[in-house]
Amino acid sequence: MTQVIEKNNQKRLHLPYLDGLRGLAALYVVLVHVEPSMGGELPLHWLLLVRIMQYGAFSVVSFIVLSGYVLMLPVARSENGHLTGSFINYLKRRARRILPPYYIALLICIFISAVVFVLEQFTSFRWNKLAGAGAFDPHFSWIDVISHLLLVHNLHSSTYLTINPPMWTIATEWQTYFIFPLLLLPIWRCWGLLSVVIISFTIGLIPISFTNGFLASANPWFLGIFTLGMAAADIGFSQKTQLVAIKNSLPWGRLAIIFTGMAVITEWRRLGLHIWINQSFAGLAFACLIIYLTKSIMENKQPPLALQILQHPWAIALGTFSYSLYLTHGPVLVFVRYGLFYLPLSPDMFAAASYVVGTAISLIVAYWFYLFCERPFMSNFLKQRKIKDVLISETSTKN
């Protein structure tokens, strides 16, 4: 892994463990969106698992931190602190990477909704909301469709969780792609890293602090969390004396653990704290973790347990199609649940089948979606990361 970094020091950098982090975070989101209850109370022994699954927002935070980190990497490693190529070329690259799979997944959801609508109009079929509970709803308005097509559905509470609820984060990330080069990078170049983090959090907190929750559905504080990813890249690769000293002096692994604990504690609803607080602590935890793991790789140290897990070929393979998994798992889980709901299953069996069957089918569908709807739009660099090559590499290593 270290050889990859050294060999490509002036070229495009790829840290495989980032794919592992992205993949495991996406898998956790899938598990969070499983609805294991048949409508009544879950058996007591399932409650612990349900509680473990209450931190889905932390996975979304990891995506935002990763986005800031990956976009900032070439800037932090450059000599002039600018993006490679023009602003238009940058947008074209980002659009090609995320928009085609997004729109294909959206059209599939609209098609499913149209089928349900026709069945309800011309047959005795009626969509059972209890059986179809989860991260997809076939009933939505034209406003929902238009806002999703324009990637602005996250800006209003009435649209951001319609159609395919996880998609609201895609809109937030897409909007951040514009803010990054037009606002964040100029601030960073003029006033430095600390200034861009403080200003971004200030901008992000204004809507929820002074406008009665205006734009709260977009989680505007994610702008500040995005800059935490930028900070991780800058600290990790900057040649500035002050940042090098910070990278080499702070206990990043311990800080990641501390901030994780603070994120979990401040998430407790009974404390009455706004969610931006626990999500910001989670963002700090992920940023510190990334600095810690990257530093460990570059210094050829014994890989810590977290790095071993994130660099495992299965985690990396999962990360390869994690975007497809994120886009498609909502409808898949809902239809698996719909089918299981009418089977003569006990609450225990229903919960177990919801997790096992729902997750398995979500992975299968996501992989095929990746092959036909995501991979064709990837850059040649990303296309080289084939899942079978990762797994073959694991087998040859063991042998």
Where are these regions (language model features)?
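Membrane-interfacial loop-to-helix junctions in multi-pass inner-membrane proteins
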Residues: 12-15, 82-103, 122-136, 176
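Alpha-helical transmembrane segments in multi-pass integral membrane proteins
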Residues: 2-17, 27, 31-56, 72-87, ...
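His/acidic/aromatic-lined binding-pocket segments of jelly-roll/cupin-type domains
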Residues: 61-63, 224
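Residues within membrane-spanning alpha-helices of integral membrane proteins
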Residues: 19, 23-26, 67, 99-106, ...
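Membrane-interface helix-loop-helix regions
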Residues: 102-170, 205, 282-295
